[in-house]
Each structure stands twice: as structure tokens, then as C-alpha cells.
């Protein structure tokens, strides 16, 4: 498991729904328990974006 997959697992455990979408203008968005991560990024970029969005949730 890479770091992104570990964060995804943590997010799901916390009741979050994470989807990859074609976002414009940002790498990630959060609204309630839903997180959108921009499609097409590298795994390290997705990891960084997901970590940032999870930080906004806690």
C-alpha cells in the first residue's frame, strides 16, 4: 500500500467519501463528508491534496 492508499483507507474509516473528479482551479475540495480529488495528478500529488483536505475536516 502506498501513502495515498493508506490515507484513502483512513478517510473511509472516518466515514468520508473520496472521489476523483475533473476539478478545475484546485487539486481538492471538501464539503461535509465528501472529498473530491482532481483526476490526472500523480500519486504523490493526490496524497498531498487528500492530506490537505482531511486536515480541513478535523
Residue ranges and their predicted role:
Residues 1-58:
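Active-site hotspot residues in diverse enzymes, especially metal/ion-binding acidic/histidine motifs
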